Amino acid sequence: MTEKIYKLLKDSPAMRWTALVLLASAMFFAYMFVDILSPLQAMLQETKGWDPAAYGTYQGSETFLNVFVFFLIFAGIILDKIGVRNTALLSGALMVIGAYLKYWAVSDGFTGGATDEYLKNFWNFFPFYEGMPSSAKMAALGFMIFGCGVEMAGITVSKGIVKWFKGKEMALAMGLKWLSPVSVLQQPY
């Protein structure tokens, strides 16, 4: 009786740890991008006319859809339905789209355009308010989309680690995964 022995990539320690480094790096850079405009608050107030309320609304928008629309629950359902690889691609796409909108909103290309004019008088209800600069509204919309991608990526990375490290060094891998967001907190601004 001949048995075929299948060796999976996750059976190789080098591949498992490479996967962990890639997953943790993705989360590290995602969390870095969450705080990227924090040091620029004063500049945004001067150049774009953002008041502290507009900046606070923008900064809080990252979690808005995850908390008030329960997107994180939907992200978990999506993860269970389409798997780790496809959910990772979807969360990455959401982060790229959200990051682009956020960048566009604070760039000179947004100022004076049709979208700028449209947003000045549109959507003056929760979470936005009347008089909020349109660049802050667009940045907040982009940040909401980015936040959906980040939180979806967070649960996807956790499930990916479970998949790659099942029966092996899972506790160590999870600890190292959580080291990447903590290291962001240690970054000097």
Name each model feature, range by range.
Residues G60-I77:
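Central cavity-lining transmembrane alpha-helices of secondary-active solute carriers
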Residues A93-G131:
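C-terminal ends and interior cores of transmembrane alpha-helices
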Residues M152-F165:
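Intracellular juxtamembrane helix-capping segments at the cytosolic ends
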Residues Y31, D35, G131, S135, ...:
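Small-residue-rich segments within alpha-helical transmembrane domains of MFS-like 12-TM solute carriers
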Residues A171-Y189:
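Glycine-rich segments within core transmembrane alpha-helices of 12-TM secondary carriers
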